[in-house]
Amino acid sequence: MRLTYIFHSGFAIETDRCILIFDYWMDPEGIVPQLLKTEKPVYVFSSHFHEDHFNREIFSWRQTRSDIIYILSKDILKHRRVQKEEADVWLAKGGTWSDGLIRVAATGSNDSGVSWIVETDGRRIFHAGDLNNWYARFLTDDYRGGLVYSAEFGIDVNPEKEEKRFLGELKDIRKITDSFSVVMFPVDGRIGNGYTRGARQFIDTFQVGLLVPMHFVASGFESAWRMKEFTDAKNIPFWCISREGDSIEF
């Protein structure tokens, strides 16, 4: 299988029999038009309504490939970003779908929408969407509990409670499986100290064949690479993405 980094949290996976595209936002290197030239079935996933994970441009691809299957989180419909008939499959946490070629399970998120488990060609793939321990930077030695103000998000949060929600989602996912061939997971230095904590907790919970960082822009590549010291300690391969359009075989 070939995994290609498109941008931010957007990826394409090409197998011997199909193409999977996750959380498309932008395509600086023009990856998608080349993929749409194939005769393989194409499946497009969007994990939630945030603009950095969902772009209505995906529906314009039907002009090139009328047979694309769109698999979207139900929260996108709830936020009126699309009409129901525009997507083929709508899933919320706990929902599943299969067509014989791929099997999809929508797992939870402690933010918006869902995360995805996709099984195809003997591989189990995980895309986290916005599942992450987003407020880990507040869990310092001097934190005494309760609410703290997050200037980035403009809200008061309880980081201890948020971490429990995140770990609860991991527990629910583990009820389905304890291992993945490849995992795409947020490692976003913009959220401050502790930005690797969620990914570290994930690899402590699951067997991972390859960990792939996401949820950053060009300025965040090197900060994402810091996660490699933690994957190396557990003998987990880590992909140090260096630019949009990078690919790796796994």
Protein language model features and the residues they cover:
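Active-site neighborhood of phospho(di)ester-bond hydrolases with catalytic His/Asp-centered motifs
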Residues: I21-W25, K40-F54, Y70-D75, F126-D130, ...
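Binuclear metal-ion centers of metallo-dependent hydrolases, dominated by the metallo-beta-lactamase
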Residues: M1-H8, R81-W97, I191, Y195-F250
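Active-site HxH/HxHxD metal-binding segment of metal-dependent hydrolases
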Residues: P33-W97
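A short, compositionally biased micro-patch
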Residues: I6-H8, D16, S109, E119
